[in-house]
Amino acid sequence: MFSIAAVRWKLLLAAGMVSLAAAPAYLCAQQKPRKAELQAISPTFWNLFEHGAKLTQVATGFGFTEGPVWDESDFLWVSDETLNEIFKVDVKTGEKKKVIALGDPDGSTYDKQHRLLDCASVLRAVIRLSPDGTKYTILADHFEGKRLNSPNDVVLGPDGAIYFTDPTSDLPKGAKQEIPFKGIYRIAEDGKLQLLIKDRTDPNGLAFSPDGKRLYVDDSTEQTIWVYDFKPDGSVANGRLFGKETADPKEGVPDGMKVDKQGNLYVVGPRGIWVWSAAGEHIGTIVVPEQPANLTWGDSDYATLYITAETSVYRISTKAHGFVPYL
């Protein structure tokens, strides 16, 4: 079995969507098969999970899954980066329905009006889909006259603005990098695009703390998680290291992340989902058979984690309740 990044790049290369020269070195490795399990590092891990909690497969047969978003109609939106589709997945039956063809869709979320936002890498844009998901509007694709790189993940901020990361990992084959850095941006409610951070090596997943005072961003190449103080005007300050996912990168790297109402972080990392306390302690890991890319809270009480991992979607019940910014 290949690592998540290697699987992704093999498929994107085969589709002619990316170039081999653009791939970071950590994307070319193999990993050993693994079984699903919960690995506690601290006893506090069991405050979040029952000892007998099981990870189960919801649906499979995808190309490469990303960007899950729970809808209260009991389905998941799921991006498929290699099949170039966004799907609706019935979580009771596992049935999947194609909604829209879209080149390399990635991280997703809802906005305040419950409209789906997606990072469309081939378009090099953040887009908003129509209510039925069949049409889209571009919200951001240029910064200061230059095209964005390849937007990767997106989150709704406590101020109602949209925040997203813009690495180069999904830059389309033959495309020129016009912006000389990999930024983290804010789309204000009036549509204005603002650069917040430009000194990260490979920004990927991002999330806000439940009190709206912190912005977390992970860096796939550095295998780090950073935290910033979030200000009422939408700016950030005092960036500092929150945690480091120290493991062989061929087992996976930091990617999507979510937060629960107590402030614990659930971050994609080597072998699965790394669970961090709000104080920055790695308290345990959800080991997933396929390497995850992203996750979301779901079900009526938002106590279930839905995880997109390579060709499948998985879920696990928790004793926590998810912090969902758009509710």
Q: Which functions belong to the PLM regions below?
A:
Residues 164-179:
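Short, conserved, GDST-rich strand-edge loop motifs in beta-rich repeat architectures
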